[in-house]
């Protein structure tokens, strides 16, 4: 995909016909990605969550929880999550933070306490500050099991626990809002076809090492993020707007395969069957 984008944007020298073809292909790819994203959200909200509820598994979808869980969340956050959080300031044209490939971050907008701004108008005239904070997956699971209540089991996203306690991270600020973001970096390996075998090996070694620090080829963000918030991040991280992909509130939904099964009511599929693609004729080769 990155190769076609390079042609479409003129980064790679190509004739006009190749550029137009690449632009059309990139557009079709983006449309398909967005279609699949919408379908995934629909399946999650209309099938997975109701199925969990039928098995007495309540999966909180926001920072708002039942009163009997509030003290647990405060304690869990303070003891298990807070020690691993490292907010990094984002300052356009002054500080450029490096976002790691395929990692979830929380983008946060806040205002210094004492900055009154325009009287009678919330946040108007106040100077916002921005931070990003990587979710500590290597230290804490993405999905947290909360204490059982009655016959129900409860689960929660780690990012929602952080949002519920975010004021304690920034005691000198009024937190305005926070949203999940994620970037994907260019992982394509383009090889000089004229190189000999030894040169190709060295090219591959060099390019593999750089895959995690390659150029940003996709910036996924919570579609509920206000336009001015998104504009700031795009400018601060120097994101090409063609790489923007609106997502849902919770990103990296492939992590659902690690969802806890507290009452063993959800039967895991040990040998998942491949999906049948009706658009392909099994009698013909797709390479013809």
Question: Where do the PLM segments sit?
Answer:
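N-terminal localization/anchoring segments of enzymes in phospholipid and broader phosphate metabolism
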Residues: 1-288
């Amino acid at each position: 995909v990155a190769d076609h984008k390079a042609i479409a944007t003129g980064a790679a020298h190509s004739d006009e016909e190749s550029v137009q073809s690449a632009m059309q292909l990139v557009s079709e790819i983006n449309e398909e990605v967005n279609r699949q994203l919408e379908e995934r959200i629909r399946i999650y909200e209309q099938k997975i969550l109701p199925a969990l509820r039928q098995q007495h598994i309540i999966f909180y979808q926001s920072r708002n929880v039942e009163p009997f869980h509030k003290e647990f969340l405060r304690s869990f956050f303070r003891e298990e999550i807070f020690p691993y959080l490292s907010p990094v300031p984002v300052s356009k044209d002054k500080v450029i933070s490096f976002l790691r490939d395929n990692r979830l971050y929380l983008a946060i907008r806040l205002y210094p306490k004492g900055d009154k701004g325009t009287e009678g108008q919330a946040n108007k005239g106040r100077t916002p500050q921005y931070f990003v904070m990587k979710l500590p997956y290597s230290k804490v699971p993405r999905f947290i099991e909360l204490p059982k209540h009655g016959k129900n089991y409860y689960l929660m996203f780690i990012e929602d626990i952080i949002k519920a306690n975010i004021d304690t991270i920034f005691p000198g600020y009024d937190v305005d809002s926070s949203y999940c973001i994620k970037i994907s970096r260019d992982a394509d390996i383009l090889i000089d076809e004229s190189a000999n075998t030894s040169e190709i090996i060295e090219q591959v070694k060099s390019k593999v090492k750089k895959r995690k620090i390659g150029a940003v080829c996709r910036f996924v963000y919570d579609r509920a993020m206000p336009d001015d918030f998104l504009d700031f991040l795009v400018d601060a991280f120097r994101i090409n707007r063609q790489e923007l992909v609106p997502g849902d509130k919770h990103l990296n939904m492939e992590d659902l395969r690690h969802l806890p099964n507290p009452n063993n009511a959800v039967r895991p599929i040990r040998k998942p069957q491949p999906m049948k693609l009706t658009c392909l004729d099994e009698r013909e080769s797709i390479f013809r």
